[in-house]
């Protein structure tokens, strides 16, 4: 349903953000917000379109894959105090979103 972060068997991640990817990112975000789940789009622009990269001369369309990915990523809640019941609620809401599609 959504693309999850890949974790290799030798890795032990310490997630700073839990970012998923989906083509209907904005619809999913709206649905989660309506259900009381805070999300974020932490990286709305690919690097080549940031103001800090302007002097490099890149323009929209130069990196189409990066631009496509920037439109798909959504950060879900992740923090040490997140309770198992809250995690289950988030998962249930995401599943319900796709059941409604």
Predicted feature locations:
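PLP-dependent aminotransferase class I/II
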Residues: 1-101
């Amino acid at each position: 349903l959504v693309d999850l972060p890949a974790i290799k068997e030798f890795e032990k991640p310490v997630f700073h953000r839990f970012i998923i990817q989906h083509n209907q990112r904005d619809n999913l975000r709206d649905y989660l917000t309506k259900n009381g789940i805070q999300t974020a789009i932490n990286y709305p622009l690919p690097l080549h379109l940031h103001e800090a990269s302007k002097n490099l001369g890149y323009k929209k369309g130069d990196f189409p894959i990066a631009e496509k990915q920037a439109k798909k990523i959504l950060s879900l809640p992740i923090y040490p105090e997140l309770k198992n019941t809250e995690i289950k609620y988030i998962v249930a809401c995401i599943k319900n979103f796709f059941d409604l599609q």
